[in-house]
Amino acid sequence: MFSMKKSLLLLFFLGTISLSLCEQERDAEEEEGSENGAEDIKINRVVKCSYRPGSPDSRCK
C-alpha cells in the first residue's frame, strides 16, 4: 500500500511539473504572437494607406 501511495504521489508531482512547463511555453508563444501581431497591423496599415493616398481615413494618420 505504501509503494502505491509513493507511485501516485510521484505521478502527481511529475504531472504538476509538466503542466507548469507547458503553461510557460504557451505564455512565451502568446507573447511572441502579440509582438508579431502588432507589426502585422502596422504593415497592413501602411499597405492600405499607400493604395489610397490622400484618403481621409483615420487609420492612415
Swiss-Prot record:
UniProt subcellular location: Secreted
Keywords noted in UniProt: Amphibian defense peptide, Secreted, Signal
This protein's record includes keyword Signal: yes
Domain of life from the UniProt record: Eukaryota
Tissues in which the UniProt entry reports expression: Expressed by the skin glands.
One example of a Gene Ontology biological process annotation: defense response to Gram-positive bacterium
Proregion residues excised on maturation: 23-45
Pfam family, one: FSAP_sig_propep
Keyword Lipid biosynthesis recorded: no
Signal peptide, first to last residue: 1-22
Family from the record: Belongs to the frog skin active peptide (FSAP) family. Brevinin subfamily.
Protein name per its UniProtKB record: Odorranain-A6
Taxonomic lineage from the root: Eukaryota, Metazoa, Chordata, Craniata, Vertebrata
